[in-house]
Amino acid sequence: MSKWGHLAQTLTARKQQDLYRSRLTIDSPQAPRVMIEGREYLAFCSNDYLGLANDPRLIAAAQQALSEFGLGGGASHLVIGHHRAHHELELDLAEFTGRDRALLFSTGYMANLGVASALLGRGDYVIEDKLNHASLLDAGMLSGARLLRYRHADAEHLALRLDEVGDSRALVITDGVFSMDGDIAPLDAIAQVCHSKDAMLMVDDAHGFGVLGTEGGGCAAHFQMNQVQVPVLMGTLGKSYGAAGAFVAGSGELIETLVQFARTYIYTTSMPPAIAAAARVSLRISREETWRRERLNELVTRFRKEAIGMGYQLAASSTPIQPVFIGDAAAAMELSQALRKEGILITAIRPPTVPANTSRLRVTFSAAHTDDDLNQLLEVLHKYRGATNIAGVANA
């Protein structure tokens, strides 16, 4: 038997556990309604929170930049891949977030790995929320530092963890908005603990940037926290802002350290300049069109009231991420598939992405969703209320 025969066995086991992942291929732009294999579906599973992924103004900006800069970045930022569009976006992001400087990364995953590897090493500690995104946990494990975890959103437990590190350097990392639960980290309390214990705080605001704050400045803006209180701020441009890529914002010393030592920044090709140009327009739209966040709040408020009234168990979330807890992985998949037959796309989230017995439907809203869209979702959820097994779905 081949030494690699375990691959097939592992895949078979994953299927038997109802944890097998598969991809959908869409044939349309990202929007509330998408086309898959010739059928239109109403999607409540995108991270396009502000509804900008298919905005004609972003498309026009990208097209103009394509004619000016071409398509590819061509090289890493430190060789000849740092285009004017990148530089101007970094300036905009620094100003928007109230930080000295900002640095672009190709993805949020690479930004997180880059920060941890540049700031930490053997003898250091990285302390993370138990429910942090996988990229943050990977960043901690790969940094060379010792990884500790504290109870979810528990600043008191974080303080106890920091007491364990003694005089060693410690980087505390938390999501701003937790991607699978939608709740907001208590950044004010966490920042106070970090300050009192001389630890550096990093916030991954991938799902808060654009959604929270009057102009969409994210969790730091929501809590009115400056660069001293949140020294390392990471945000993404492919969710609320409808583009792609990510950034880290902070002091000049921090950013220059990343330029010199963050391997995921140094050893990769820059994002296409056209994406950076489109993201600049997206930032402006977010700041000016505050109705987009107001619309999200309207959708979330009504959804929560009516879904809870039907008997569904929701997470304690005020953000566009509204998980509907099912529990069993197979039951979550069955309900997701039943909704798809009704023309509604909602992804079933199962272990290991979430803890065992907490499988859920991850409902997400976009400012582009209409009242009729929400009505359709609620009607179908009403039909399947209480359906948590095969018989329940079949007989709903």
Curated annotation (Swiss-Prot):
Pathway: Cofactor biosynthesis; biotin biosynthesis. Its EC number is 2.3.1.47. GO terms for molecular function: 8-amino-7-oxononanoate synthase activity; pyridoxal phosphate binding. Pfam families: Aminotran_1_2 (PF00155). Pyridoxal 5'-phosphate binds at residues 108-109, 179, 207, 236. It is an enzyme of class 2 (transferase). One of its GO terms (biological process) is biotin biosynthetic process. Its cofactor is pyridoxal 5'-phosphate. The modification N6-(pyridoxal phosphate)lysine is found at residue 239. Substrate binds at residues 21, 133, 353. InterPro entries: Aminotrans_II_pyridoxalP_BS (IPR001917), Aminotransferase_I/II_large (IPR004839), AON_synthase_class-II (IPR050087), AONS_Archaea/Proteobacteria (IPR004723), AONS_Proteobacteria (IPR022834), PyrdxlP-dep_Trfase (IPR015424), PyrdxlP-dep_Trfase_major (IPR015421), PyrdxlP-dep_Trfase_small (IPR015422). It catalyses: 6-carboxyhexanoyl-[ACP] + L-alanine + H(+) = (8S)-8-amino-7-oxononanoate + holo-[ACP] + CO2. Keywords: Biotin biosynthesis, Pyridoxal phosphate, Transferase. Belongs to the class-II pyridoxal-phosphate-dependent aminotransferase family. BioF subfamily. Homodimer. Catalyzes the decarboxylative condensation of pimeloyl-[acyl-carrier protein] and L-alanine to produce 8-amino-7-oxononanoate (AON), [acyl-carrier protein], and carbon dioxide. This is 8-amino-7-oxononanoate synthase. The gene is bioF.
